[in-house]
């Protein structure tokens, strides 16, 4: 979040709130790893696990691959237990159009064969027309073996916080 010219009371309140939450300024485009080395619930170690990303949001670890949901797509990186730095350039799994609701939540299927990625709409109420909303406001199902993707759910303004129902797995 980078504030532009503030012209309304709402704008002033929003900027003040974002500053208080330390959310003012450009994204550092990195993922920081915090480790609790002695098990006391406090992270003693801090490492930049991965940088050079594009507004990373969602993360999933499946079979030695660390998946990152960037605003412009999903990228896979090799990962081994204990790693504190990933230097591989990564392998793009799929591309998304950026802008609009930029969060990209990720969720692995229980069997680890598929990855689900939430992509928000460009606007709030389709006020820029529906053509610009194509491929948005949905959850994609990504096949990790083939790289194929299909729309799993649609009509969702900004699908964030994907999860499986713990009892049924649905």
Task: State the predicted function of each range.
Residues 1-170:
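Beta-propeller domains with acidic blade repeats across secreted/periplasmic ectodomains
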């Amino acid at each position: 979040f980078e504030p532009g010219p503030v012209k309304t009371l709402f704008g002033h309140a929003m900027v003040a709130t974002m500053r208080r939450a330390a959310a003012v300024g450009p994204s550092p485009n990195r993922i920081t790893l915090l480790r609790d080395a002695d098990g006391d619930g406090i992270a003693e170690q801090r490492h930049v696990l991965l940088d050079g990303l594009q507004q990373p949001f969602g993360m999933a670890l499946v079979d030695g691959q660390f998946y990152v949901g960037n605003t412009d797509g999903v990228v896979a990186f090799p990962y081994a237990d204990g790693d504190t730095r990933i230097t591989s350039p990564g392998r793009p799994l799929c591309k998304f159009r950026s802008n609009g609701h930029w969060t990209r939540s990720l969720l692995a299927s229980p069997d680890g064969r598929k990855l689900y990625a939430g992509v928000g709409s460009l606007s709030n109420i389709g006020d820029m027309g529906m053509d610009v909303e194509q491929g948005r406001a949905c959850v994609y199902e990504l096949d990790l073996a083939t790289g194929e993707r299909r729309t799993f759910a649609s009509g969702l303004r900004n699908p964030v916080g994907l999860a499986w129902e713990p009892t049924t797995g649905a």
